[in-house]
Each structure stands twice: as C-alpha cells, then as structure tokens.
Regions:
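Two-component histidine phosphotransfer core
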Residues: 1-185
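C-terminal end segment of the histidine kinase catalytic
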Residues: 189-191
Length: 191
C-alpha cells in the first residue's frame, strides 16, 4: 500500500509543474486568439483531468470506461496544444469497458509518447489505444526528437511496478526501431 501511495505521489508530482504550465500556455493562446468556446471547453477538460488525478490517483483499480473518459479529457489538452499534428486513435471493444486496470495507467504512456517524439504538421503523430483479446494496447510510432529530452525511465518503471503490485500480472513492452507498444492485461469484473 505504501509503495502504491508513493507511486501515486510521484505520478502527481510528474504531472503538476510541467504539464500545468504547458496547459496554461495553451489556454492563454486560445484566449489571445479569441477562441472563447474552445477556451471554455479547454478549462472544463483541464479541470476534469486534475480532478480525476486527485480523486482517483490513490484508487487501485478503475474500469476501462472511467479511464477512457479521463483520457478523452487529457488528450483534448494535447490536441489543442498540437493542433492538426497529434491524433488519438481509440478502438475499444465495448465488452471490455467494464473490465478494470490500475488507475492512471494510460497517462504516463501518452505523456512519454509526446515527450520523446517529434510532432509536426508535415508528419502528424498518432497514438493508438485499442483492445486485443483482453489486453489494452497503447502504441505509437517512434519519431525521435533531434535533441531528445532526458529520460529517467521512472514513469514506465513505475507503471510496470504498480501494475504488478495491484494485479499480480505484468505488462508487455515492445520497443522496436519503428514503434513503441505497451500491452496491459485487463481484469474481468468480479460478478
């Protein structure tokens, strides 16, 4: 339990400063350009994102449906920041929406994909989230930045450890020259 709480605190710490300031910059841009409706939606999605992290970060398991609603809000923030450059391709079989996974499992994968890859209008970047026979799969092409940001690997290791602690199962990481894929085993709901 203490390890899970420590992982949660670390996750929240990773999100707060950098992500928050980037979000405020994106919001300021919307206001400056007088995109009032988009700015209001952005505020709603940002609020939902932080509320979800604070309220559910210490929860052990969430349904895939709850996690996808969070990702919808979280991804909107990135889509505004990377207008016409970043896309989320979500293909989830409805039968898995009631299955569970550790809370906030998708956030670090999306954050890492954005952090470590070049995202330009000439080469739009796609992050795929899909289900495959009881697994949740997050995949993205590898388009390394010319000047990569330093990586500690803590976010991915934290996810791996939390997953094993909470579910007793391991995630699978497939890292090739062209693609980065993480496969996470979903848990059937107990009836």
């Amino acid at each position: 339990q203490m390890c899970i709480r420590g992982s949660y605190n670390m996750l929240v710490g990773q999100i707060n400063p950098h992500f928050f300031f980037n979000s405020l910059n994106s919001l300021a841009m919307l206001v400056r350009e007088k995109h009032d409706d988009k700015a209001l939606t952005y505020i709603d999605q940002l609020s939902y994102t932080f509320r979800y992290i604070i309220q559910n970060g210490q929860s052990t398991l969430m349904t895939l449906d709850e996690e996808l609603k969070f990702i919808e809000a979280y991804s909107y923030l990135f889509e505004i920041r990377y207008a016409d450059k970043l896309f989320f391709d979500i293909d989830v079989d409805d039968k898995y929406r009631s299955w569970t996974l550790p809370a906030l499992s998708l956030q670090p994968l999306i954050g890492n994909a954005v952090k470590h890859n070049t995202i330009t209008r000439s080469k739009p970047f796609h992050i795929s989230i899909r289900t495959e026979q009881g697994w949740l799969v997050v995949a993205n092409p590898k388009v390394p930045k010319i000047e990569p940001e330093p990586s500690t690997g803590i976010g991915l290791e934290n996810l791996r450890n939390r997953w094993h602690l909470i579910t007793g199962r391991d995630i699978e990481i497939i890292d090739t020259d062209k693609e980065f894929v993480v496969r996470m085993p979903l848990q059937k709901p107990v009836i």
